[in-house]
């Protein structure tokens, strides 16, 4: 990918929620590669809810793993939708089977991406969420 930066990405405030440290580091690296500079990381869904409830800022995007212990990505999505109805939410999953897709759509996930993913795939999903032309 020649120019992997998303125009205006440096202004986006992103909350990344991932319980697997290796997947978390990969996602952080990929987000930085596409130009996300303002990144807050939560180690799981419960941590994310705490960050959201305490935060003085509003995030522009939440990127969350689906399968996490205690507070799942679905539980986090439901919490977010109760308070921030229109906040863009990108779900990460290792298994996008039919049940996942139906449940995600029913709960108004904005987009999802299957792990492992490339910088180009993440760039495309985020660009589409914000209607940003990258070519």
PLM feature spans:
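Non-catalytic signal-transmission and effector/linker regions of two-component phosphorelay proteins
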Residues: 1-15, 120-135
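Conserved acidic carboxylate
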Residues: 18
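Two-component/phosphorelay signaling modules centered on CheY-like receiver
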Residues: 21-41
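Alpha4 helix (beta4-alpha4-beta5 surface) of REC/receiver domains from two-component response regulators
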Residues: 28, 75, 96-111
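Short hydrophobic/Thr-rich beta-strand motif most characteristic of the beta2 strand and flanking loop
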Residues: 36-43, 51, 113
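Acidic catalytic/metal-coordinating carboxylates
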Residues: 44-47, 72-75
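Active-site residues of response regulator receiver
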Residues: 65, 93
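Receiver (REC) domain active-site loop signature in two-component systems and cognate sites
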Residues: 68
């Amino acid at each position: 990918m020649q120019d992997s930066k998303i125009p205006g990405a440096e202004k986006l405030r992103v909350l990344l929620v991932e319980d697997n440290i290796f997947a978390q580091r990969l996602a952080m690296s990929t987000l930085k590669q596409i130009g996300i500079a303002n990144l807050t990381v939560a180690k799981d869904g419960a941590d994310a809810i705490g960050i959201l409830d305490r935060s003085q800022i509003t995030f522009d995007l939440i990127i969350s793993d689906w399968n996490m212990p205690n507070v799942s990505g679905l539980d986090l999505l439901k919490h977010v939708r109760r308070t921030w109805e229109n906040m863009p939410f990108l779900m990460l999953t290792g298994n996008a089977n039919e049940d996942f897709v139906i449940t995600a759509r029913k709960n108004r996930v904005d987009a999802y991406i299957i792990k492992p993913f490339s910088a180009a795939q993440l760039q495309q999903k985020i660009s589409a969420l914000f209607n940003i032309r990258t070519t």
